[in-house]
Amino acid sequence: LFQNLVKSIYFRLFGFVFFVSVSFLMAEPNALEDIGEGKRLQSENNCRKAIQFYQSALQKNRNSIDAKLGVADCSFKLGAFRESKKFYLEILDREPKHIPAVTGLSGIYLLDSDFNAIAKLIDPLLIEYPNHTALRITEAKSLQKQGKLDSAIYKIKTLGTKLEEPPDLLRMLAELYFTKQNFNDSYNSIDSYTKKEPNDPEGFAFKAKVLLYQNYFHPNQLKSVLPIVEETLQNSLNLDPKGEMARFYSVYHDIILSNFTSNKEMKRRAFRTIYELAREFPDNQLYHSLEANLAWELGETKFATYHYRRALQLDDLDELLRFEAEEYSIASEKEESKLRRELGDYRRDRFYSEKYSFYHKSSLFHLKRAKDLSPQTPVIRKELLEFYNQTGEAVKYTNLLLRLREEDPNSFKLQNKLEFSIKNLKESIEFREGYLQIDPNLIQENTVRFSPEVYVFDLESSLPFPYHLQAGRLLGEAIRYNLKQIQSVRVIDGNEFNQIRGLLKESSFHPFSQTLPFAIDDLHLLDTKRRNAVKIRYIVHGKYQIKDGDIRVDVSLYDRDSLRDIATWSTNQRGRDSLPTVIHRIGERIREILPKEGKILKIKKDEVIVSLGKDDGLKKDSKLEFQRKGNTLFQGVITELGKSISSVKPNVRGWEKELATGDDVILPTDSGKEKKGK
């Protein structure tokens, strides 16, 4: 009986082992088939399907290194970095020297700039395999992100020479040169790469990218290489019709060609391509912002509205994009629209946050933008009323009270404020001299300003292909917007500004950003419509760079009389409210630099009325100079200081015979310094 029992157990155990062995042998070929199919799909950049086959292979053979590597690589490409890291670590637990897993895991550490972790992975292997191209490329990528480009280039070039320039090293070298903005060497490297690897679609896409960047600052050369760029992109798309890089740079190509040829259909083609990319990659903010911009230009308002909202949801710290969305919304949407209302609410909230902060002056930018976006909002009106009252903007204060009274005619509080404000206006020098007209429902200012005139050019990007297509124009518009709030500066705007832009565009414009660059040879175009009138004297121009959320602007103020830049300075700010802060600093600096100048409006018995006042920075004890054709005649003291005009008594006898209406009046520089010192 015992022997029979032992035999029975033996046969059962043998059967189980035989079954497991057969199952394993049958499963292994099936797993290999899945891995093979996964690799094929992965080579076609179809990681979403490839990963399913790798996972299927793991179910059949959970120890398969190839299947785990496939899941890790595809997860990385799809942005599932935690899953990718898990499988790379599982591979390295079994095979610590598995180089594809080492380089893959290093790529994840690179995302977090964990350079020490990368060094721990690759340094021991580099000692053992100093000529391994994948390890050297991983090392170069780490050095590249650390900003050690020269070291990375040296190591890749040295190894490339030793190994007779293998394709993967040429590709890496092209990227390193590109990062260093050495576009000539980058092009030579990628050109050599595409000759050795003619079936790599990304190689051709990168080659087209380098060609565009190489010629960005030379519009004529950029135009001449467009056919080569198109051919190179087509080579890439023939190899991989869904290639992301090639499709994206075809958008840039079509935008440039459209602007060169004024071909709207070409821009519509760019719009259709970016439309597809934005849907395939819904978390890519650049795609959404670019689609919104093109939609605005093409009149596709539904698309523009949706994609501005989506882009701001992805990054609400993007100050340039927010300003662009506001410009679009003010121009194209009704006040009650969802986007415009959201933008107005944001500016209102930022104003409240900054109102009593260190940056309280730049907070006024938020208030003014909130007014433009939501002029009928009660809380905005309340804040504007308080602001006008505090800053002495009596006319704006009274006009806002008049509008509020129309809406609430029975409010005694409003009526009392209105009566008191009108009483003060009637006591002002502006009213007595006839420069204020008080009607039942409106106060009109008739003061003529003679303060310095300023034309603001678009700012030029310091880097090729700025992230924001309109950034240069937007920064110029933001500077103009802020300067218009400064009474002592007259900004060229409206019809005259548009006429000048039209003339400048005929002379020169950038075919990608459509910015109009500052050029001394074109400045005569500023006065074309003025004929014998006073010429525009001051020009604001400069460059900008937006990198990692930091807005940096290099500004120059050009004086056409002295034919030189009279001031050049830089300013930068990072993060939320960076745009208002930078723009406020620029405006204040321009206000300080420009002379305080006006003219004699009236000559009276004992005094003269001049077009300078508190708005121009004058104080009661300021001394003014009278000039004619640049020659100083004599000085005068202020007897009554108004908001926009003042009464001045010249300090010499017989002045009545010397002065005439239209003579220049300036606040001397010494007086300004003295005043500042006090």
Regions found by a protein language model. Name each.
Residues 43-44, 77-78, 107, 111-112, ...:
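Register position in tetratricopeptide repeats
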Residues 70, 104, 138, 172, ...:
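Canonical tetratricopeptide repeat
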Residues 222, 226, 249, 267-269, ...:
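Pro/Ala/Gly-rich low-complexity, hydrophilic intrinsically disordered segments
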Residues 449-521, 540, 603:
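Short beta-strand->alpha-helix linker/helix-N-cap micro-motif
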Residues 521, 528-575, 641-642:
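Amphipathic beta-strand/beta-sheet edge segments enriched in Tyr/Trp
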